[in-house]
């Protein structure tokens, strides 16, 4: 693009340093908005279809500010590939198994029974368990070695545990929370008065036909 080349050359002359044009994105739509944050440290472009009036432009500018602040990875859940979802689930499962204290009580009780019956615990940990097993702060009385042993037992019994409905509910709840954090439309809108309105609901309140089609977020030093 000749205009872009000339603009780039002009900026190079003004700054007095050699610049390299490392990346760019072309964004098109019925409505496009941009936002620059931190003196140029973060730049955002966002595009939408379905509306192009002033209200839509203001809404997209607000959403661009949201993207700069919250750094979502996707616009909607539907944009996340099946492979990425499967990877997220596997990581979440392993994370839960490596944190026995967070496991549902029936599963945890089973792990404790195996640890005691298999003499996995040291004498001190076995005694602490017997004395404090009804204490909700039981894990405060166990050594790190005992906690590690429980995690190893959980991982060894992974195939059976993942079939447990309670465990699956725990995993799905954690995944849902993660997806809300990385998906723009599911994030709480940062300017919402009640702190609960999602970006999706905010856009619908402005214009039900306004649909985001693309977002771009660049940050200085990113990807280098």
Segments predicted by a language model, with ranges:
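N-terminal assembly/interaction segments in proteins that build large macromolecular machines
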Residues: 1-224
């Amino acid at each position: 693009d000749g205009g872009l080349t000339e603009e780039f050359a002009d900026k190079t002359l003004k700054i007095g340093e050699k610049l390299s044009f490392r990346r760019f994105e072309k964004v098109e739509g019925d409505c496009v908005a941009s936002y620059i944050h931190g003196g140029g440290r973060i730049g955002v472009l966002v595009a939408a279809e379905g509306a192009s009036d002033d209200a839509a432009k203001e809404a997209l500018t607000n959403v661009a500010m949201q993207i700069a602040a919250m750094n979502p990875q996707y616009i909607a859940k539907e944009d996340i590939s099946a492979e990425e979802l499967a990877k997220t689930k596997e990581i979440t499962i392993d994370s839960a198994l490596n944190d026995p204290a967070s496991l549902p009580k029936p599963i945890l009780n089973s792990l404790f029974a195996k640890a005691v019956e298999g003499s996995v615990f040291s004498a001190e940990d076995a005694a602490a368990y017997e004395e404090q097993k009804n204490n909700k702060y039981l894990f405060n009385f166990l050594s790190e070695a005992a906690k590690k042993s429980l995690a190893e037992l959980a991982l060894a019994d992974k195939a059976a545990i993942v079939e447990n409905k309670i465990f699956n509910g725990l995993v799905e709840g954690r995944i849902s929370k993660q997806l809300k954090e990385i998906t723009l439309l599911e994030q709480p809108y940062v300017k919402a008065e009640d702190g609960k309105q999602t970006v999706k609901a905010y856009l619908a309140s402005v214009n039900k036909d306004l649909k985001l089609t693309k977002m771009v977020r660049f940050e200085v030093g990113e990807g280098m």
